[in-house]
């Protein structure tokens, strides 16, 4: 497509787009001035990619590895199906793309690179549940008319292999050695924080899945799994970067200020790591937020169903009409 604006104009527009996206950044730390006023180093890893699309008058393309499958830990989540947490998050992503079109007419597109198939066997999720979860995500996107969002997953890449063979091929072609990952975790603060976050999730889940085992044994086994999750997740990142070389990389994990990935908040959380697939959702009368299912039940929150399925919690003191009109909020 022919360029229609000059480089100076494209840089100004691209910076406006990035600063808008940065309003929703998920950061490792919130103590630096960059939290409120992103600096040139914050913009630098992404500016050229955004400019590529602006200079070609094309929608900005974001890629987001996310929406894998629900955690198998029913102390955290309501079940295996997407619920209000996923609905709110998908609507946020569509809204973000729509908002960008107010800054830049071609707008934005976003590809969810669903990574559930990549490491489901490591996190205690069956391939059947990954498939069901993905099908419902697609149905929600269609129901919402979320035309800016599409989904890519591992079976789109390797159509003629079993799920186990897909995972093996991914690691063989794109994976680092476990030794290299251990070295990175040992010597890089961000990699160490990532490992600790993944290890914590795994320990929480396997304490429920394998309650007959000691905590020490579970922690040790989950260390091995955490390294493999990182190995496959990194391999997935390399693959999608190869497929989408110009695209802007979003992440559901918190990132450093000047990272090559933009950590993104899709829904209110109590911590930096919360996601809809590791939590339940509660409506407080004004907005939705993520909390562990067990915490909400212990606090007396009321379960609300949609179409016969558990969807979210609401505080019991909220008037009934608030719950009835909850769809207006999202």
Swiss-Prot record:
| Protein name per UniProt | L-tryptophan isonitrile synthase AmbI2
Name the source organism: Fischerella ambigua (strain UTEX 1903)
Q: Which UniProt keywords apply?
A: Lyase
Keyword Transit peptide among record annotations:
no
- InterPro entries given in the database record: Isocyanide_synthase_DIT1, PvcA
Documented EC number(s): 4.1.99.25
Q: Which family does it belong to?
A: Belongs to the isocyanide synthase family.
Reading the lineage from the top rank, the first entry is: Bacteria
Reaction(s) the record says it catalyses: D-ribulose 5-phosphate + L-tryptophan = (2S)-3-(1H-indol-3-yl)-2-isocyanopropanoate + hydroxyacetone + formaldehyde + phosphate + H2O + H(+)
Taxonomic lineage of this organism? Bacteria, Bacillati, Cyanobacteriota, Cyanophyceae, Nostocales
């Amino acid at each position: 497509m022919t360029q229609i604006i000059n480089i100076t104009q494209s840089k100004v527009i691209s910076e406006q787009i990035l600063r808008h996206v940065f309003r929703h950044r998920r950061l490792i730390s919130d103590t630096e001035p960059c939290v409120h006023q992103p600096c040139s180093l914050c913009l630098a890893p992404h500016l050229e990619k955004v400019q590529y699309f602006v200079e070609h008058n094309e929608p900005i393309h974001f890629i987001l590895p996310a929406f894998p499958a629900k955690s198998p830990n029913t102390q955290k989540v309501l079940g295996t199906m997407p619920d209000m947490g996923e609905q709110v998050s998908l609507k946020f992503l569509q809204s973000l793309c729509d908002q960008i079109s107010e800054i830049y007419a071609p707008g934005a597109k976003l590809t969810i690179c669903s990574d559930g198939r990549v490491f489901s066997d490591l996190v205690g999720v069956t391939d059947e549940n990954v498939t069901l979860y993905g099908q419902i995500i697609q149905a929600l996107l269609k129901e919402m008319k979320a035309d800016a969002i599409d989904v890519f997953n591992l079976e789109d890449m390797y159509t003629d292999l079993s799920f186990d063979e897909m995972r093996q091929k991914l690691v063989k072609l794109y994976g680092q050695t476990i030794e290299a990952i251990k070295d990175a975790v040992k010597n890089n603060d961000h990699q160490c924080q990532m490992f600790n976050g993944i290890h914590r999730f795994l320990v929480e889940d396997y304490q429920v899945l394998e309650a007959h085992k000691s905590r020490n044994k579970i922690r040790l086994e989950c260390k091995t799994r955490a390294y493999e999750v990182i190995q496959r997740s990194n391999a997935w990142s390399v693959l999608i970067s190869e497929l989408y070389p110009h695209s802007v990389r979003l992440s559901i994990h918190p990132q450093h200020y000047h990272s090559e990935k933009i950590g993104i908040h899709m829904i209110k959380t109590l911590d930096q790591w919360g996601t809809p697939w590791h939590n339940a959702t509660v409506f407080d009368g004004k907005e939705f937020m993520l909390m562990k299912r067990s915490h909400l039940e212990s606090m007396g929150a009321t379960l609300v169903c949609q179409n016969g399925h558990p969807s979210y919690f609401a505080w019991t003191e909220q008037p009934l009409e608030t719950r009835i009109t909850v769809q207006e909020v999202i």
